From Swiss-Prot:
Residues 1-32 form the signal peptide. Ulvan lyase involved in ulvan degradation. Ulvan is the main polysaccharide component of the Ulvales (green seaweed) cell wall. It is composed of disaccharide building blocks comprising 3-sulfated rhamnose (Rha3S) linked to D-glucuronic acid (GlcA), L-iduronic acid (IduA), or D-xylose (Xyl). Ulvan lyase catalyzes preferentially the endolytic cleavage of the glycosidic bond between Rha3S and the uronic acid GlcA, but not IduA, producing oligosaccharides that have unsaturated 4-deoxy-L-threo-hex-4-enopyranosiduronic acid (deltaUA) at the non-reducing end. The gene is ullA. This is Ulvan lyase, long isoform. Coiled coil: none annotated. It comes from Glaciecola sp. (strain KUL10). Its EC number is 4.2.2.-. Keywords: Calcium, Lyase, Metal-binding, Signal. One of its GO terms (biological process) is polysaccharide catabolic process.
Amino acid sequence: MTAQKSKYFNRIMTMNTLLFSLLTVGFSQAYADVVLEKQVKITDDGLHFDGKDLNHGNIDSADPGEKYDFFFGPNISAHGDAVKTYKHYVFMTWYKGGKSERNVMLSRYNTQTQTIATIEFPHRHTGFRGNPLIGESHNTIGLAVSPNNGTIHMVYDLHAYDDNNHDGKFKDDFFRYSFSVENAADLPDDQFTLDKFVKDTSSISQGPDDYKHISMTGDIADKSNFARLTYPKFFTTTDGTLLLYMRLGGNNNGAYVFNRYDEETQTWSKFTKFNENNQKNFGNPYNWGLYGNMKYVNGKLRVGFQQRSSDNNDRYQYQNGVYYAYSDHPEGFGDWKNHKDDEITYPLVNSDEIKVLEPGDYISHQEANSVYIVGSFDWTVTKKGDVHFISKVRSTNRSRPDYEEEYLHSYKPAGADEFITTTDFTGASQIYTAGDNIYIVGLKNGRPYVERAKGGTNDFVRVYEATSGPVFDHGTLYIKDGKVYYYLMEKTSGNAMPLYLQIIDLDLESEANAPQVAFPSTSLTVEQGYEQLSLGIDATSSIEGRTIESVTLYLNDELVRTDTTVPYLFGHASKPHETGAMGWKDEHEPNPNPLGPGEHIFKAVAVDSEGDTGLATMRLTVQSNAPMVSFPTQLIEVDEGYEKLSVSVDASSSVEGRTIESVTLFINGEEVRTDTTIPYLWGHGSKPHETGAMGWREDHAPNPNPFLAGEYVFTAIATDSQGEQSETSMTLIVNGEATPPIVTWPNEVVTVTEGYKRLGITIEAEASSENATIESVTLYRNDELVRVDTKYKWNFGHSFAPYEFGAMGWLETHEPNPSPLLAGTHTFKVVAKDSTGLEGEAFMTLIVLPPAGPSISFDEPDIELMTGYESLSVSTYVATVNESVDIISVALFIDDVLVRENLEAPYVWGDANHPNELLSLEVGSYEFKAIARDTNDQVSEVSLLVSITLFGDFDGDNDVDRTDVRAFSSAIRSGEALDQRYDFNEDGVVDRSDTRGLTKICSRPRCAS
């Protein structure tokens, strides 16, 4: 769909007389006071990454010393879903600094007693892909407290891990979930301790002090449901149910998944997908990932995101679009709809079903990868149902001469059919809601500020800004019951920095009773010297019985006047100057202090009969009467030794009767010459050297001081007949001797496995001079010519030339490469040649590894069963070494006897289609072996031990006799948990009355005696 577009422009008033009546369309909502209620320091030792921002090219150079290098970003504490409230407590998660500590921490602040209790967990941040020398900012700690049973829940320190990736470093530890016993959240400070959290005592526990659980269901057999997840975020529904959402998969092939907490069983459900990943498998033309959030707002589970497509040849460098959906199911398990309330496919496959708008439409670029839509994206929904998105779009290349950038605010007021999109928005990274308002909360010069607007509008007003106190580096926040809980890290130094909590009261209660105040418009533009500006203020109370006592007007925070009678009119004929106007009647003396050029803020404060106040603001822009002056262009580039440069200046006055007296040119602050006649021209034939040129006519002597390579700022100052001045600037870049093209590989080192099917690489090549173009890019392999490419894009190894990097080929039309690259190290060189004949080169190392077999693991731990068992199934997780290799089959053997060979996933035995194939095993131990074979003919295997014991054999002697009967009776008396199969009399419990049933299966006579 096409969203409604609306670009807002201030109205420029060309007449000198203005009269604003109460009928003028426009509105600015009244607001009560927003105040900092409390600030408290939580710790001095929050972990922060203070080293280098690494990438895949220098990942092996991490600092082993004190500096903490990082991947993705420097923030990990006061980051992510790290602050929540429960009753009168505020809970905060963080990692302990410095670099050698890294423990997971949980702090609880009691707002009544002002005390802080902190728990230190044994787990330490494992670092980027398991390297503790490199911090990873994505490994945040998600936090929730159940309002229904006081349990605390944390998911942390993970980024799409599973048993097999990153060299198996996260085997049996790829998901980290910790939870407390009931009512731990309320305990006194001295009892708020680590032992209130439940240890992992499963067969894959990491040790006696392991508080991390790999599954949230309570069953480690479900662990595969918790693999490859990132970005934990908890929600609380209107009835107190906890939900958790995470991202499954990667950047351009992912899904949002969520699950639910059951207070009765104190376990969580398995994850449910909002959308499918691997969307091509479900008929979509491409795979896509999500960059945004799932949120529970206004009583519903919702999603809002930008899409990152696997199509790398569209005009978007990374993300595109704005997408939105919501669920009418109380916990999101179905009934999903788009913003038009149309039902959508669930799980979602085609994202176009929920597309709202395309930010890329707000700039003009159409070339491949020319549009950049990353960052400054968020969304929210108000209590009454206004939907708001903020986003940013810009040119990918910041250096291009036609660079474009727009901040967008797209909103759909409750009850509206379409979204309104405005570029009259200064931008933000997050947007929040409380009640019917929307908020922007952030840091300015390191201190918090709050801006607020009524939902369904773009009328943002700054209602709070701190001007003193600590200077902060970053923070994350949570809004609850009209208060902002802003969790912040102070900007100091090192890898252990202080953490603070600020509680900011949004004063929603007072706002509900506050008078409603409105200017005729939220903004206005006038010309300098305007004669009349009459402002009628509308002030009313929505509370029955209340009246407006007064309206006070302020101009730039200076008191103008208080009016106590309707109409509340300022700048009328008796007081023409109070709004900055000159005056318009014959009896009006000219204003001795008119408003000068620039922006000015009018503020109206209304007081009602109960003393409650409301305010509104209006921005007035006064345009200057100074001359208008401009160069033809803002940037000129020439080559060193240029012969001619004539520079003209356009200067005029917008005020009738005024003329331009002179224009003076300065270069790098040094005066060149003043010109008093049109055209205002420098560097003409009579003065060829004044702009740094050599001269171009035979009668021109060579310039003894020509401009050398560098940057020069030309400034023109125009003066009009009233002595008013304006200036403008232009930059001249003098290029030195031409430099060769810049050519780069996406990665300087690429590693593949022998037999790889596909390797295509696009080379970046750019001429150093703006006047030159790239004519060709030539590829060499181990110093042998591969191909000369003369057409952009510089793409090698594509489907029409699949063998250029030694690959086998991947399409049905590709014959197998007769000379593939074998295991070893190979050097590739590209040479870019520009239109001036200059050449630049770059090298790439291709490492071909010997073929590796697939990775395979059983999804189950070792199994123990008793004879007579009724069901048994096992499954394997199998992955190839890379996407170019496929699995041919997985076969299961029991003690080297083939059970069945599976030719396609899922690789399960004993499933519904083959329920009996693993039954009837006799007493003994069996080796279950799964063997996987891939298209490289590589084989890997994994084994599982299955032990079958005799039903009723308690002493392990392979028969059932009186000794076993006595052992059974003893177990009953001591209260041991026994298998439900021993409930012989089928009364629902295993007790002494079942002893007779055991005697009936004795394998020896006189068993009961």
